[in-house]
Amino acid sequence: MTNPTLLCDGCGQAAAAEHVTQRLQRLEWMTRYRPVHVGTVLLGAYSPDAESDFLYAETEETAGEAARVLAAVGISPDRKTKEVVLSEFQRGGFLLGYVLECPLEPESRSEVAVAALLKARMPAFLARLRRSFQPKRLASISSKLDPFLAGLTEKELGCALVSDGGKSFALDGPSAEKEIEKLREAHAAARAAGR
């Protein structure tokens, strides 16, 4: 049972001890493979539930979102250890981050609740993006972020926004394969242009 007075500082949800422990574990895994110089932050709305879907988890299986992200950046996990895959991702200058650093709790799964959490956390995430990550580029991989990124300038972000005509590359949507290809092409063009 969660204590409604304790809110997680990584997502803003009511948090039990297990929630905080899971957040800290995932933060530790991500930090281990954070590039010294971040080229591109791939930004999701919230962390996936399953550890196999969380790219940085110490699992052998890479599924769901993690597999789609690797496909989008051209890294194949076939016949490689997770450590090798994550090292390639790191050397490529990629960092996968989330506005809400934790999976959604059952009471936070409605569209309205997700939108409210994202709206509340966006200022803190943008500060972290500018002050800590300091990437050259940001590419959103969740359509849930479109209302919050629309209209933001390069100055507000602290980096270039790589987008699909002003929209996110919806790797969390029904046309993920098409979005993977769009992201791959847009990212290559942004790198070639020096953005």
Which residues does each PLM region occupy?
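A polyanion-binding, active-site-adjacent surface
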Residues: 2-155, 159-162
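Short, flexible loop segments at boundaries between secondary-structure elements
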Residues: 70-78, 157-191
